[in-house]
């Protein structure tokens, strides 16, 4: 599936239609919202170009960060937090639904070897050394933002206790708490999918 699943399999259009909310659903394919080592500039597109284009096409869209939220499921949850932490001047909040929040543990282990996943993730991030501590590492990005003294967006995280990403979410939650970054955490005894997310 791709970003269109939200329109096809949820009621999101019905929810936002009466609220005056612009619901923008871009794709970065399998590139994890990253300017990849193979040259695709998905991060630049999603964090800089897309907001500008949307506001040019729809001038009534607010450019106030408090009016802009990034949200996503799974890889999109990682992308949402990355937008919140890495483009905090644009996004005032970020919501991750069963997101890949500990990229070092959840993806980093796939960077070694000759598997299809290893080739995919090396094409995105390069080596584990290049990934760890970079702006693609959400925990390093949070620390960088906190150190800068800039306002930190509201962070929301929802992950089922049976989800394979749950342990990574717990590590991210603990890290944020240790570093004084507030977030809203919801976890429940199931796996999150579109049927119970929206």
Language-model features and meaning:
Residues 1-198:
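Non-catalytic cap/lid and distal C-terminal segments of serine-dependent acyl enzymes
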